[in-house]
Amino acid sequence: MDFPLPALLAIEDYDENEGKLAASIRWLISRVYEEKRDMPDKLRDGVQRDENGHFQIDEAVVGALCNGSLYAQAAAKIFKESALVTKGHGAVLAVLTDYGIDVLHDGNELVEEAQLVASAPFNMSAHLAIIDALMMAHLRDVIPVSRVVEAVSRHTAVEPSEKPIDSVDALLFWINKICLLVRDDVEREDSNTNIPEMEDLYEDISDGQCLCALLHWYRPHEMPVADISFNDSATTRDCQYNLMLLQLFCRHHLAVDPFHFEIEDLLYLRDSLQMNVNAFLADLFVQFEPPVTPEPVETPRIGPSPRRFVPASAIPDLRAANAAARSSMHNRNRPRMYNPPPAVSHSQGPSRSVSRMSQDSLFYSRPASIALQRRSMDQDSVTDFQTIRQGFENQAGTAQLNRYDGSVTASVRLAMEEKRRKHDQQMAQMSFSSANETERLEKSKAAFFALRKNDNDQTSKGKEEWYDHFEAKLRALELRVGLEEGEDGTQSARLNRASSQPSVVQAGQTYPANYMTLPMNAAAQMTQSYIQHPQTPHDYYMQQQMQQQQQQQAQAQSNYASPSQLRNSLSNGMINHAGYIVQSMYPGDYQQQQQQMQMQQGQMPVQPVGAYTPEGYFIPHHMQPIPVQQGYQQMPQPGMGFNGMPATSQPGFNMEGSPAQMGYIQTANKPLDMEMPMQQQPPQQPPQQMLPPNQNAFHLHSKSDDATQVQADPPLEINRNLTNWGMTYKQEMPARSIPSRRTWQNETFIKNELDLVNSKESVPHITDETTTQPEEAARRFPDLMLDNHSENLAPGRGFSRQNDRDDLSTGRKSDDSPTDTPGRTFDDDEGSGENMEKIANERRIAKKAALIAKTMKRKEEIETKVDLAEQRNAERRQVENEKKELALRKKVEKEQQRQKILDEYKRKKLEKELGAELSARSTGRGHSQPPFIRTKSQMSEVTESSRQNTPRMRGQSSVEQRVSVSSLAEPTHKLYAKTVTKSNRGLINNALQFSVFPGAVNNATRQATITQMASSSSKHFLILFRDQKCQYRGLYTWDEISDTAVKISGQGPPKCTEAMMNSMFKYDSGAKNFTNIATKHLSATIDGFAILDQYWQKARIPHSGTPAHKNN
């Protein structure tokens, strides 16, 4: 690309403070207004050069800087805090301090808000300091090291050892990596072109080569590599050309122009512009490497998901096509499939046109019961708005819907309001019934305790036997009523709960066919016949207690228990008994019972189980008394029993049909531990002809050969104890040895895993007397064995029978001899309770021990992990300390080696200089001795001795006394020769031509400096630099006597002493550069020096509004 290069400003005329201020203000305005078209006109050209080349700041820019609006808006965008937009300088300074950036100016002074607000005079240093702080915050925000490494990793490989340490190092790392990639591409086509790398970001940026190569990598068409000037020894013109390429590219090919410099700002780069360079490179990085937004990752679904063989995706325009088809087709012309029935039923599901996105796309077959159940559940809880809308379409037609008048919405709202009202009524009824249930439960408890109190006062044997036998019969009735729920859902739920006990239902059985129910009305009539018969002892007993309970009768009549509460104990699972046939106690009720049994063969709703006494008390189902009749005779019909069933052998009744002596049926947890007097044993009746069992009788399981093993399941025993309100009763009898009752025998109960681990015995055995001695119980208590007792046991009892035979073979038999105590004993299962308590205690101890062991183990593991972590950290710290010590030791050794080399170099150079002087003195003179070299110490000794021995002559100056006469100390005679000081004028002249002022652009400055040096008669010249980067500031001469440098040209102090100098340089004419020398004293080997920062005077730019500036 060929374009004319404008004239550059001479280096002595360039003012870095003006360039810094202009670049900083431009960056601040561009940060606030990212697009140039949004920038106000007064701020767009707020900083310009006048005709004389001086910068001028517009009053609008000064006002915006002093009121803090520009700073606040820039800080709001950098820190992403919108609240800062309306704040002032104080808020910006506070947020910068919180961010860890101190705003300092003039050394180490903090910038105050008053300095920024003041406009006359305009405090330029304070404003530059806050702009630099904002640049630093912007750099930290957009140039994190990880982001730069990630961006470079997308182009080339990055080694872990190459990762930068800070943001500035990251920018240098990014530029060098891209330059290496460009070099690889260019070398394939042209091997003569050499793409350089940047060793120092600020020194190597002036030639513009690396930045142009960077632009070529990202925009090869806008910045061709052939247009870039690559030259190892680049001249000032080459640097200016590359920088103008960079400026034009940023102005025309980038969305936001980040180049806010003048060409001289980068060509004569000063330290004050380093932060501006950082901000410029950061903006380039953001535009070339924008942040990558990660694509959203779909979170995997947790839990069961519907099985889909094809992905479910919406069919485009599916609903629109259906709507168009419906609108275009008239009702009378529609096919039958489009004509919905006029009467919409609740059981009809939603239309197929309604979106079913929540359902599976692959329909599968379902059982009819599930479909019916789901339909019945949905019809009361789902409002089908589609069917409502279709109903209105049929009535008013499609045309009315097109002319929408709000009737459809009003109808939908009315339907919803009606549904909400019904729901509120149901919730109110449920709340009221729940409250009534609690109240009735408390009253039922009170009635029960009152009845128990009266029962405990009566100790006669007949009453107890009467209660006992009546309770046994009601237990059998309870078993039938417990299965009287009737509905499929309730029955299936109970069957599932019963099937969870292995002793009740065995695997492989089809148990629903074996279950039968008892009509509830017949049971209620039989129960009522116990109480209302005029000849029962119960009526006689109740008449005696009538007077004592008259006051409580009115109150107790309102304390009836609800049927739902009375069924709580019935709904706790299947009771493990064989099937029973309930007998009618009185022949007068036989015909009525027979009619009820024939009418109610199907499923009947559950009725309350229990009866009411004449006093008004309610007798629960498990505590109702049975009246005992001794002489009542009734002749049954031939071949028929008292319950209307075919007559079979009834071991519990005599020929007259009267009930035998009182018996007790073990239902939940009452042991069969009763005896009957021998004089009350009924005579053995001849066996009658066995008839087929009644198919309407209740069967819990399929038939079994052995019906003597009757046992309840353990969970049901515990539940029955809990429903007895904690009340047990017992009649004393002589002590006897009773083996422990076996609670269960299949050893398949569920235990805690801690018990299985810590307990030696996996299953506790508790022996039951009724299980170990079934034949004895059948012989002693024939009235307890009901009809078909042996035909209704589950086949899974074979295992229990085998265990019972084993127990009988070991001699665990109960004493069947009668005792003197009449009646029977009601045991509260103390032995079983103690065993269960013992087992529970052992479980608690085992759980506690396991918990403690687990806690200790966990604690030990944590301590072990902590120790391992501390050990690893200690080892890592030790390795790091060793590395630091090794690096420090290497550094010290390196410094010592360098110092040793420097001292050796100085010694050799001094000897060489002294030898040259001696050879010059002895030129042209013959002598017998060869020339020898004296050291500096010998020369000083000779000088001192000559001063002491030789007296001062008149007219001789003190300066002449300082000249050493080495010949006086010589053993031979030599001629006197005055020492000639060596001059570095030629070296300084070479440095000015090739190092300090290279190129044609600096001819005028170079010639003027050389002319001033030629006019001086001094022998040794020194060049003043700004810092270690060897930026020219002035030319000085060295006074050897006073060790003072005196200025003859350029900038800087008039005189400089050694105390003012911080570094000294020596010029290498071959390499054409200056080298820093580690010394603090001036000597003949020094060619340049730099002074401390506090001795530099900063030029003040006059305010644009001051009269002095206007005069210029």
Swiss-Prot record:
Gene3D superfamilies registered for this protein in UniProt: Calponin-like domain (1.10.418.10), CKK domain (3.10.20.360)
Q: Where is the composition biased (Polar residues)?
A: 345-358, 489-504, 935-951
Bias-annotated ranges (Basic and acidic residues): 802-816
Residue ranges that the Swiss-Prot or TrEMBL entry lists as coiled coil: 850-914
GO-annotated molecular function: calmodulin binding; microtubule minus-end binding
Q: Which domain of life is it from?
A: Eukaryota
Q: Which GO terms describe its biological process?
A: cytoplasmic microtubule organization; negative regulation of microtubule depolymerization; nematode larval development
Q: Name one GO cellular component term.
A: sarcolemma
Among SUPFAM superfamilies, the record links this protein to:
Calponin-homology domain, CH-domain, PRC-barrel domain
The record's subcellular location field reads: Cell projection, Axon; Cell projection, Dendrite; Cell membrane, Sarcolemma; Cytoplasm, Cytosol
Region of interest (Disordered), residue spans: 324-358, 485-504, 542-566, 788-834, 916-965
Q: Which UniProt keywords apply?
A: Cell membrane, Cell projection, Coiled coil, Cytoplasm, Cytoskeleton, Membrane, Microtubule
Q: Which CDD domains match?
A: CH_SF
Principal localisation: other
What is the tissue specificity?
Expressed in larval and adult epidermis, intestine and pharynx. Broadly expressed in the nervous system. Expressed in body wall muscle cells.
Residue ranges with Low complexity bias:
542-557, 956-965
Q: Where is each CKK domain found?
A: 972-1109
Gene disruption: observed consequences: Viable with no gross morphological defects, but exhibit uncoordinated locomotion and body positioning. Small reduction in the density of microtubule bundles along the length of the body. Fewer microtubules in the axons of PLM and ALM neurons. Defective touch neuron morphology with ectopic neurites extending from the cell bodies of ALM neurons.
How would you summarize the oligomeric state and partners of this protein?
Interacts with dapk-1.
Give the family, as the similarity comment puts it.
Answer: Belongs to the CAMSAP1 family.
Domain notes for this protein: The CKK domain binds microtubules. Might be required for microtubule stabilization. The Calponin-homology (CH) domain might negatively regulate the CKK domain.
This chain belongs to the protein called Patronin (microtubule-binding protein) homolog
State the organism named in the record.
Caenorhabditis elegans
